[in-house]
């Protein structure tokens, strides 16, 4: 029943907004990589956006907020290069994380960078993005985490 409701909601949004993928203000979708989750992006200017990510990994989750700048890439229509920075807070289960020494919960707070490419489809209201989001944990289990390479698929509106 829940899946049917989500599908009907998604379909009604798609029909009501029509096809206008050339320009968009908001997007929501799935992010996949070593961490999987959801992503929501909102443009605050024509080039700058805020991106919120809720990702799950190692029996816990991570909340990330990023500020991103978008510029045209390689003279290809609807292809954008983006870069930015932000912060995260994560809550992890030590039993599920191979890098933690003790079997207890961990909380980390840190800063992030992001660099990537995004393509906006003209014919359908979707985009696809590939990015690398390294992070540096400053509080909790400190250290650099550079393996966050991800592919995101978003519905734009």
Where are these regions (language model features)?
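Outer-membrane beta-barrel translocator domains and adjoining extracellular loop/strand segments
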Residues: 65-66, 94-101, 140-147
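Transmembrane beta-strand segments that form the barrel wall of outer-membrane beta-barrel proteins
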Residues: 22-34, 44-58, 85-89, 130-138
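Residues that define the transmembrane beta-barrel architecture of outer-membrane proteins
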Residues: 24, 32-36, 59-63, 79, ...
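Bacterial N-terminal signal peptides
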Residues: 8-16
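Gram-negative outer-membrane beta-barrel proteins
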Residues: 36, 60, 73-75, 91-97, ...
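Short loop/turn motifs that connect adjacent beta-strands in outer-membrane beta-barrel proteins
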Residues: 20-25, 47, 72-80, 121-126
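Residues on the lipid-exposed face of transmembrane beta-strands in outer-membrane beta-barrel proteins
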Residues: 30, 38-42, 65-69, 85-87, ...
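Flexible, solvent-exposed loop segments that connect beta-strands
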Residues: 48-52, 91-107
């Amino acid at each position: 029943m829940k899946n049917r409701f989500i599908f009907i909601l998604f379909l009604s949004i798609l029909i009501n907004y029509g096809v206008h993928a050339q320009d968009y203000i908001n997007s929501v979708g799935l992010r996949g990589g070593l961490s999987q989750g959801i992503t929501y992006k909102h443009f605050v200017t024509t080039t700058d956006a805020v991106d919120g990510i809720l990702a799950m990994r190692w029996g816990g989750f991570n909340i990330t907020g990023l500020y991103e700048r978008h510029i045209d890439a390689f003279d290809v229509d609807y292809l954008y290069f983006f870069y930015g920075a932000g912060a995260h807070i994560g809550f992890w289960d030590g039993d599920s994380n191979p890098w933690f020494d003790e079997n207890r919960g961990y909380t980390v707070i840190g800063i992030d960078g992001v660099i990537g490419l995004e393509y906006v489809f003209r014919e359908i209201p979707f985009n696809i993005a590939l990015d690398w989001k390294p992070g540096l944990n400053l509080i909790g289990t400190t250290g650099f985490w550079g393996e966050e390479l991800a592919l995101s698929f978003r519905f734009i509106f």
